[in-house]
Design a protein with these regions (language model features):
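Basic, flexible Lys/Arg- and Gly-enriched helix-loop patches that mediate nucleic-acid binding at interfaces
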Residues: 1-253
């Protein structure tokens, strides 16, 4: 299933989405030997070139045996970015990962620099696509802290849905988790991954998010005891069981 080029390459860690959009505007990118422009789409298995140099997007090189799928869970602390390189010199999550058993790690569903919690990595581009594309409706679960003491009507409005600048948005589930020291806590679930969507939903209702932590992504949960900055490779048999529950076909409603 095709995806916008900047989204595919950003997910593979080739650069920031904004930076990749600049490459497209400047005519520096080719896909399968053809020059592409902003707005064009590509498949995860396509060949990408920047200024004539092939970009490594995590798949096997020509002639190599197919990859054995691996998944790594990382507890991202705040302050780290999810690109391979950062022009501002900030630490990137890739600096703290062990080598992939084959191929290289691709991040599934980025987190912004001020968000902590679960990051999923895989060396399988097809699996990454299934986990990220909205048509597969993979749930993401977060713990959110907002300033103040919103009334119960806030949860109801965000469950029904509101209009953001890039279209309607809503939480599939939103559950109050109590209050402490001038803040209110919620656990929220949604099945798409638009840029800063959790923060923007609350901000659209006048409530600033002061802390955001991802707890789960699809079948993967942040392991108990996995401290910030640490990672864990899911064992093969456990991974097989977890992936068995994934949708194998997109919802095309």
């Amino acid at each position: 299933m095709s995806e916008r080029i900047q989204k595919l390459l950003a997910a593979a860690g080739a650069g920031s989405r904004r930076g990749i959009e600049e490459w497209l505007r400047d005519g520096r990118l080719k896909v399968n030997g053809q020059l592409v422009k902003l707005g064009d789409r590509a498949e995860p298995g396509d060949r990408f070139e920047l200024d004539g140099q092939v970009l490594d997007t995590g798949g096997p090189a020509a002639g190599e045996a197919p990859l054995v799928t691996a998944v790594l869970l990382y507890h991202k602390p705040t302050g780290e970015v999810t690109t391979r390189r950062d022009p501002q010199g900030r630490p990137t999550v890739f600096e703290f990962l062990p080598p992939a058993p084959s191929g290289r790690w691709v991040v599934v569903g980025r987190l912004d620099v001020n968000t902590s919690g679960l990051l999923v990595f895989t060396n399988d581009g097809g699996l990454a696509h299934r986990l990220m594309h909205p048509s597969f409706e993979v749930e993401r679960r977060y713990l959110v802290r907002v300033r103040g003491a919103p009334g119960p009507e806030l949860a109801e409005r965000l469950r029904r849905g509101i209009q953001l600048e890039d279209g309607p948005a809503r939480f599939d589930r939103i559950e109050p988790q109590g209050r402490s020291e001038g803040h209110s806590w919620y656990q929220v679930t949604l099945s798409e991954g638009r840029n800063r969507e959790v923060r923007r939903l609350f901000e659209a209702e006048g409530h600033e998010v002061s802390r955001l932590k991802r707890l789960a992504y699809g079948p993967f949960e942040l392991p108990e005891g996995l401290t910030p900055g640490k990672s864990w490779v899911v064992p093969g048999l456990e991974l097989e069981k977890l992936l068995a529950g994934l949708k194998t076909a997109p919802n095309l409603r």
